[in-house]
């Protein structure tokens, strides 16, 4: 049985015109896993996420997790018709990081009423929505950030999250049936001394099979012959 990838949003840290930020939906056999949940994603999900079984967050930059906040308000004021809360898988220490925000806003209950909270461990596999996931640490401006290898039905899907060029990224993509990889930069020298993103050439150099570039600014041309993600795009893996 195939796995379907739907690009809900794919903008970089500044939104492309009319586009949501990072959110990628994997579905198979009535199971649904959302990778990242940036601004604009919730409103573009079918049923505003009512069928999403689990969410996994690569890192805590706003363009990858910002719509967790409206998801909480939606659940509080217009709760979807569902039997149980979706699982939310966070990087190590993530539960407390969210709790700090909730206390600051004066709503310490917001996350527990919205999600079943979990933290994943680097390099250790965990299961979410029936998918087997391995979180692999990648370099991103010195913060804690991860890419994911996702397995189901004999297929392996790799997602870079946000990453600089690194051997860890190559290992993440090795042997994958499909690699969704960010390509934010026009060239590597446009990044800072402490790297955090990839150019298209750097993204392609890490690939080991079929690839889809994402997190790509609208201002940059797509490399000739290389597919680039757009909102609403559907890929069968």
Question: For the regions a protein language model found, what residue spans apply to each?
Answer:
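General small-molecule cofactor/ligand-binding pocket signal
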Residues: 6, 89, 116-121, 134-136, ...
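Active-site-proximal loop/helix segment associated with metal-binding centers of metalloenzymes
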Residues: 14-19, 112, 119-188
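A short helix->loop->beta-strand "cap" motif at the edges of active sites that frequently abuts
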Residues: 31, 82-86, 207-211
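Active-site metal-binding motif and surrounding structural segment of the metallo-beta-lactamase
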Residues: 40-87, 175-177
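Active-site neighborhood of divalent metal-dependent phosphoester bond hydrolases
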Residues: 81-86, 94-117
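Cap/insert and terminal regions of metallo-dependent hydrolase folds
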Residues: 164-237
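Active-site neighborhood of phospho(di)ester-bond hydrolases with catalytic His/Asp-centered motifs
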Residues: 34-38, 53-63, 91, 157-161, ...
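Conserved beta-strand hairpin/beta-sheet module of binuclear metal-dependent hydrolase folds
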Residues: 1-48, 145-161, 178
């Amino acid at each position: 049985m195939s796995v379907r990838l739907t690009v809900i949003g794919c903008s970089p840290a500044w939104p492309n015109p009319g586009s949501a930020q990072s959110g990628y939906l994997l579905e198979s056999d009535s199971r649904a896993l959302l990778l990242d949940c940036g601004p604009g994603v919730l409103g573009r999900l079918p049923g505003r996420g009512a069928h999403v079984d689990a969410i996994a967050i690569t890192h805590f930059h706003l363009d990858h997790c910002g719509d967790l906040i409206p998801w909480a308000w939606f659940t509080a004021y217009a709760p979807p018709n569902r039997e149980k809360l979706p699982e939310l898988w966070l990087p190590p220490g993530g539960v407390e990081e969210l709790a700090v925000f909730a206390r600051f806003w004066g709503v310490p209950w917001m996350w527990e009423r919205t999600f079943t909270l979990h933290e994943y461990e680097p390099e250790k596999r965990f299961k979410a929505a029936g998918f087997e996931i391995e979180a692999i640490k990648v370099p991103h401006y010195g913060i804690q950030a991860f890419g994911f290898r996702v397995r189901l039905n004999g297929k392996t899907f790799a997602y870079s999250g946000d990453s600089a060029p690194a051997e860890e990224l190559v290992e993440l993509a090795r042997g994958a049936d499909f690699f969704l990889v960010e390509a934010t930069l026009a060239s590597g020298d446009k990044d800072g001394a402490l790297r955090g993103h990839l150019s298209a050439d750097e993204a392609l150099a890490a690939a080991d099979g079929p690839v889809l570039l994402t997190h790509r600014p609208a201002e940059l041309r797509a490399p000739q012959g290389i597919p680039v993600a757009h909102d609403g795009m559907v890929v069968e893996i």
